[in-house]
């Protein structure tokens, strides 16, 4: 069962010091946190240090923020949340970055 808050804290403790103004962070996942603590403070900290933070979500937008999905909370601290379910959507996201 996903626990993004725990995963973010572990990542931050191991690699947070490596994030800098030239860093782009890509977060990949459905943001379904199984009602655990969100750990969104980590994304906020990453965003303050990084050049960009983006979230790529494999679920259809119509599923976002339903049930245990907290993509809206996480997205608050990113430069954008994008539906990314296939190569076409991934390509469109990459083109936006170029």
What is the predicted function of each stretch?
Residues 27-28, 39, 52-56:
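Short, local alpha-helical segments
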Residues 44-98:
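Von Willebrand factor type A / integrin I
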Residues 35-37, 92-93:
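Extracytoplasmic/secreted cell-surface and envelope-processing proteins
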Residues 1-23, 59-60, 65-66:
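Von Willebrand factor
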Residues 23-34, 79:
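DG-centered beta-turn motif at the end of beta-strands
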Residues 34-35, 62:
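Catalytic P-loop NTPase motifs of RecA-like helicase/translocase cores
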Residues 38-44:
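Charged helix-capping and loop-helix junction motifs
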